[in-house]
Amino acid sequence: MTALRLLLTLITVLALALVLAIYTLGPAALETAQNRVAGDKGEAPSADAVALHQSLDIADLHADTLLWYRSMLERSDRGQVDVPRMLDGNMAIQMLTVVTKSPSGQNYDSNSADASDNITLLALIQRWPLRTRNSLYERAMYQADRLHVFAAESDSLAVVTSSEELKQVLKSREDDSKLIAGLLGTEGSHSLDGDLDNIKRLYDAGFRMMSLQHFFDNKLGGSLHGESNTGLTDFGREAVRLMDSMGIMIDVSHSSPQVVGDVLNLIDSPLIVSHTGFKGHCDQKRNISDDLMMRIAERGGLIGVGF
């Protein structure tokens, strides 16, 4: 009996140690494995290049930093983005997009919307609030809350929600301020949880850019990496019209060519392709056609090319 009791005690201790290890070491291990920086740093830039860089207002249209379990205010050796490194890089504007769902086996070619979700486990290991367990909308709101907390605790980061606020940040930088404008965006509008009223709620939380799709088809329409290759649904059309009426920037970086064309035909506002490449230069599924890129540019749109 004593031996059995000792065995059960040992099993309990080992189980508790495993749980403790998962919750303490798991978040860093996950980001190290999944948020990798590829390649080496290359040659150091010339003095002229550094001087030019320092003279510019540098903007990055895409970063998933809020997904990970670490403070943006502390320098990290994981990933690429935190406030100390943004200051080093003379960043003026940083778009911070929130990831709320990622299909298992995610790839550029074809993903099922019914595939198991990677973010559910990530959120569990990173101890996200219970409300985020089954709601993509709550996952977006949680990450937005994190950004607002970081900004409140920093003299170098401000959450910007209007063109006037952005102008003020850029003006302050002319006076040697190092203030960084942080903007909120969604990585796919499945974060609406199928409810158009959530557009207003996300807007009130500070979101000023919404991408329509990510790596899978959703209620708004087809993804560039989904299975249907369809255009906007009726729900998608309603969502796009509402976003546009509120002044929300619409990002089509992961949308099917049919969705991109539908959006161009539906509204007159400029679009954003926040992170992409040119299909004529790199012919793969990740990049939309040069013809669509030209239509977006002719409309006054903004295209962010990965490097």
Residue spans of the language-model regions?
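A signal for specific C-terminal beta-sheet/loop modules enriched in small/flexible residues
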Residues: 1, 84-86, 233-234, 270, ...
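N-terminal hydrophobic targeting/anchoring segments and the immediately downstream early-domain regions
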Residues: 2-227, 283-306
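Generic detector of well-ordered alpha-helical packing
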Residues: 61-65, 252, 276
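Histidine/acidic residue-rich metal-binding segments in metalloenzymes
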Residues: 194-204, 225-251, 255-272, 285-301
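Generic beta-strand/beta-sheet core signal
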Residues: 213, 253, 274-276, 306
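Active-site environment of non-heme Fe oxygenases that use a 2-His-1-carboxylate facial triad
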Residues: 280
